[in-house]
Amino acid sequence: MGNEGKEDTLPSKFGRYTLVEKLATGGMAEVFKAKILSAHGFEKQLVIKRILPHLAADRNFVSMFIDEAKLTAQLIHPKIVQVTDFGEVAGQYFIALEYVEGFDALALLRTSAQRQVRIPLPITIFVMMEVLDALDYAHNAIDGGGKT
């Protein structure tokens, strides 16, 4: 298997993707900036969300992850990243997502708190309105079977 998916040796191959940088690790999954290379020099950046290894054997969790991939793939909205692929590599399930360049909101909040500087209210309101627009869409989305 080589260095298949080992984050301590980035960049590393993960199936047809190359994991370039670890972006985050949560309680259930880890997220990587990645790229896919194809014919004639085609290259695309994306994000790989991969189940943590210790959860990969939990059938209930894997089932929830699969449901997440299926549901999220149905959400087509300009403020929601698109699912581009779903699969399994060497027993590790993953979701491939559109990569969106931007700033780290958590880092902004932490820096603001450390410096005791408030984020200007118009910026806060704008960000919240954008998030609420996406949440409203996701909450009211209807699947192919007519269910919300």
How would you label these PLM feature ranges?
Residues 1-148:
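Conserved ATP-binding/catalytic core of the eukaryotic-like protein kinase fold
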